[in-house]
């Protein structure tokens, strides 16, 4: 078995991307395979593990951490955001949790505690970059979050979660933010004022890197 055959013998999340990138499979065949991601394998498994309030929880870990990284995993599988099960999962997450700060600790908490919905983000650019990318992928692009990130760009062109204590950008934070901004820009198109501002900010961020 060669490497391509090995990838094609994997679960749908891997197989459809291997078909798209490494074979001559038709777009229809690739789309049909991609549609299976939310129905079987790890994509379906992660959807099934979502709790009633929209969170994914892991013992000993903050709710925001396990939820954010599960969402990033789902995006990496290429799960179809138009599938009913995916749309329901995103609606639960959006309705059931809020970002807020209690006792100097940001966390995802019940909606009655107030704060931002998941896709509106919190205060750290590295987290918000990932959150912005997720909102763009799952059909909930948040302009308020994009504008917040634009306002937090440092003089050297990048971003840093430790700003304003540090005036020097971080590669990690900058990459997280740039990934979010480009995903948002692709989701909304290039004709809007905010998309033009994003394009300019991205160029500065890329020059910093």
Predicted regions and their residues:
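Preference for long, amphipathic alpha-helical scaffolds in soluble/luminal domains
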Residues: 1-209
């Amino acid at each position: 078995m060669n490497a391509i055959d090995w990838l094609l013998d994997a679960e749908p999340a891997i197989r459809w991307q291997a078909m798209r990138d490494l074979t001559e499979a038709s777009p229809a065949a690739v789309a049909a395979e991609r549609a299976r991601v939310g129905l079987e394998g790890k994509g379906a498994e992660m959807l099934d593990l979502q709790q009633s309030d929209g969170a994914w929880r892991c013992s000993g870990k903050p709710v925001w951490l396990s939820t954010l990284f599960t969402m990033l995993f789902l995006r990496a599988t290429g799960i179809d955001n138009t599938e009913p099960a995916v749309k329901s999962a995103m609606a639960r997450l959006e309705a059931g949790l809020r970002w807020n700060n209690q006792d100097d600790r940001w966390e995802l908490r019940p909606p009655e505690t107030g704060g931002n919905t998941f896709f509106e983000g919190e205060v750290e650019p590295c987290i918000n970059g990932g959150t912005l990318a997720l909102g763009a992928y799952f059909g909930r692009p948040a302009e308020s979050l994009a504008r917040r990130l634009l306002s937090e760009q440092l003089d050297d062109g990048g971003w840093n979660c430790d700003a304003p204590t540090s005036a020097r950008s971080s590669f990690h934070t900058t990459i997280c933010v740039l990934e979010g901004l480009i995903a948002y820009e692709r989701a909304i198109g290039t004709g809007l004022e905010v998309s033009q501002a994003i394009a300019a900010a991205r160029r500065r961020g890329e020059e910093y890197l």
